[in-house]
């Protein structure tokens, strides 16, 4: 999972966020932002992320509120013999008004509507999934729900809790970076003073 925040890119490929500075980002700014994000939990409220992570982890087809979805059946195309022309086996699953679906945690809704969720239709604020893989309408319906659960799990990933050891590590990095910054300022200041002392006799 990768999230852009200001001048920083957050990459969630490990249990902890790995912060990578953009090319135009200065080292001092990068360190200060890293410490701020980890120490102050500015990425989001801890409880919200825990709730969202637990919700995604427990998500399954049988636990979905079926009355929140609209199901439509149409005639399928492709191979299938006479059954294709006679039976409306193609299933289209729609979840309207995603932003107002209170049964989905807010943090999950934010991710689903961010453009990373392949089944999200921004214009109608809806999730639309289709399946005509089989000749059975019930099987196609089940496949729509399975696609929904699978895609949510793949798209919505949340970081684990930041340990005290990690926070301490980044505080040390910040302290070291501050010392280097002050030293650089002193060296620069001394250079300016030395240049001002040079006098030329003509």
UniProtKB/Swiss-Prot annotation:
InterPro entries associated with the record: Mito_Release_Factor_mL62 (IPR052104), Pep_chain_release_fac_I (IPR000352)
One of the protein's GO biological processes: mitochondrial translational termination
One cellular component GO annotation, for this chain's record? mitochondrial large ribosomal subunit
Q: What is a single molecular function from GO for this protein?
A: translation release factor activity, codon nonspecific
One Pfam assignment:
RF-1
- SUPFAM superfamilies cross-referenced by the UniProt entry: Peptidyl-tRNA hydrolase domain-like
Task: Supply the Gene3D superfamilies for this chain.
Answer: 3.30.160.20
The intrachain disulfides are none
**Highest taxon above the source species:** Eukaryota
**Transmembrane intervals:** none
Q: What is this protein called?
A: Putative uncharacterized protein YOL114C
């Amino acid at each position: 999972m990768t999230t852009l925040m200001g001048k920083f890119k957050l990459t969630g490929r490990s249990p902890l966020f790995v912060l990578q500075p953009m090319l135009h980002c200065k080292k001092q700014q990068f360190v200060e932002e890293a410490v701020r994000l980890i120490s102050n939990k500015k990425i989001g409220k801890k409880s919200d992320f825990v709730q969202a992570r637990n919700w995604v982890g427990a998500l399954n087809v049988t636990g979905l509120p079926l009355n929140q979805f609209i199901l439509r059946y149409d005639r399928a195309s492709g191979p299938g013999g006479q059954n294709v022309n006679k039976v409306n086996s193609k299933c289209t699953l729609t979840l309207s008004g995603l932003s107002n679906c209170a049964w989905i945690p807010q943090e999950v809704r934010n991710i689903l509507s961010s453009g990373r969720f392949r089944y999200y239709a921004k214009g109608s604020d809806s999730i639309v999934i289709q399946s005509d893989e089989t000749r059975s309408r019930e099987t196609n319906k089940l496949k729509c729900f399975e696609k929904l659960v699978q895609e949510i799990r793949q798209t919505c990933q949340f970081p684990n809790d930041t340990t005290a050891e990690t926070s301490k590590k980044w505080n040390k990095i910040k302290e070291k970076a501050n010392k280097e910054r002050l030293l650089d300022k002193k060296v620069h200041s001394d250079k300016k003073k030395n240049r001002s002392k040079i006098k030329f006799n003509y």
